[in-house]
């Protein structure tokens, strides 16, 4: 909250002495801590999450949305941003006369990486420094700066209350004058390089570009696993009676367990930072829940047919797959960060609620936004009933072995795992480990420590 306010009133020079400035900073921080205490958004006991009732999920969701906006800046590793730029956007940028800007994509990538690596905390960049270090021609550099910088007076112009909309996430640079640019932090602002270039290409290529993003995402994830030499299976199976045709994005089979993985690009809505829980639930239905529904169809096909007969896009038979008696983990992956929503307890509570409740908006004008979510819950209940075929089951029987992760979280795990079995073990550990941190990166760290 204080960082966003500071960006709104950013000045090139301070009017205070160092000692006076430090004193005022401490006062501000204390006021912010007191404000957080008064709002009563923060829990201090891990058991609050463990024993949370499903009926309380909407309240828990709203409270966490507010806490996230107030306290937690979203961060992306520079190398992950590079991965997104190279794999998701460069193929659509064009070359020669077909490129969407006068500068090359290589120019843009070099610029972005330099800024992210240099801005380890608040950093002023001079145009002269960028020209000297990067060796980009003056005309091309000016266009890059025009694209990635927002004038200081336009940053967070309508932001006062902590749930007000911000604009700082749209551009990585704040333009203080024609030669001076400010970056808050390379990890906090790095994803804006992706946002900027996405909008540039979209303005030129339109819906053809955006529709191609899902396929590029799949190819990027497959490449990530191939580079680690982790084997995977992918394909699609055909309609068989009343069992529908489905894509099977990824199957990971280790010595002791199997994981079904489904990928979605689905971003959080812009109203997320304003704690619009209706829009967030709608996005969860379109992304995470849709992926879990697909995985339930995989399980049903295996139960009723005993095998997944997989084909490629050209209709060629790849293989007949069965996991045998190995336990199956389900993981849905979305490309952007989903903050606290990927926390184990949040995922479990939401998925369990799907089998017991429907979601409705207090505001009648917002109700239609939840239609697709509730339709998807109907589908999941139908598939679940058929999967258990008259047997008694609990909500945990259906979704206990389910994870929801951002792609950056999966990328982080891949960086520290030497074999596929180690990766699957780490995922299995996170299914049973509760830290109360609400942060998957803490869970990854703790899983590493448990392995010694």
Outline where the language-model segments fall.
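Catalytic cores of nucleic-acid endonucleases
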Residues: 265-326
């Amino acid at each position: 909250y204080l960082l966003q306010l500071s960006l709104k009133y950013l000045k090139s020079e301070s009017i205070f002495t160092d000692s006076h400035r430090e004193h005022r900073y401490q006062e501000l921080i204390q006021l912010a801590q007191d404000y957080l205490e008064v709002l009563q958004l923060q829990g201090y006991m891990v058991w609050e999450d463990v024993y949370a009732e499903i009926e309380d999920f909407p309240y828990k969701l709203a409270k966490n949305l507010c806490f996230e906006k107030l306290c937690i800046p979203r961060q992306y590793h520079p190398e992950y941003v590079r991965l997104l730029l190279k794999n998701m956007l460069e193929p659509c940028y064009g070359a020669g006369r077909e490129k969407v800007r006068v500068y090359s994509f290589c120019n843009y990538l070099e610029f972005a990486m330099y800024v992210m690596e240099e801005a380890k905390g608040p950093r002023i960049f001079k145009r002269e420094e960028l020209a000297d270090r990067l060796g980009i021609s003056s005309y091309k550099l000016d266009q890059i700066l025009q694209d990635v910088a927002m004038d200081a007076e336009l940053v967070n112009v309508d932001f006062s209350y902590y749930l007000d909309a911000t604009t700082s996430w749209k551009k990585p640079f704040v333009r203080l004058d024609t030669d001076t640019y400010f970056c808050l932090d390379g990890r906090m602002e790095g994803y804006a390089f992706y946002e900027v270039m996405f909008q540039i290409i979209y303005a030129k290529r339109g819906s053809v570009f955006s529709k191609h993003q899902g396929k590029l995402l799949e190819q990027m994830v497959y490449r990530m696993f191939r580079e680690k030499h982790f084997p995977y299976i992918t394909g699609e199976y055909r309609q068989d009676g009343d069992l529908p045709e489905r894509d099977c994005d990824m199957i990971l089979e280790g010595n002791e367990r199997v994981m079904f993985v489904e990928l979605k690009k689905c971003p959080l809505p812009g109203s997320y930072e304003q704690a619009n829980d209706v829009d967030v639930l709608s996005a969860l239905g379109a992304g995470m829940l849709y992926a879990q529904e697909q995985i339930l169809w995989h399980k049903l096909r295996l139960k009723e047919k005993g095998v997944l007969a997989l084909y490629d896009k050209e209709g060629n038979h790849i293989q007949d797959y069965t996991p045998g008696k190995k336990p199956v983990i389900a993981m849905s992956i979305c490309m952007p960060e989903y903050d606290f929503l990927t926390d184990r307890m949040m995922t479990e509570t939401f998925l369990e609620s799907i089998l017991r409740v429907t979601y409705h908006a207090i505001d009648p004008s917002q109700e239609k936004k939840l239609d697709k979510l509730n339709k998807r819950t109907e589908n999941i209940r139908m598939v679940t009933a058929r999967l258990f075929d008259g047997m008694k089951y609990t909500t945990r029987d259906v979704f206990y072995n389910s994870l929801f992760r951002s792609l950056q979280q999966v990328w982080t795990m891949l960086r520290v795992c030497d074999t596929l079995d180690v990766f699957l073990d780490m995922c299995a550990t996170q299914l049973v480990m509760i830290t109360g941190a609400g942060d998957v990166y803490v869970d990854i760290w703790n899983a590493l420590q448990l392995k010694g």
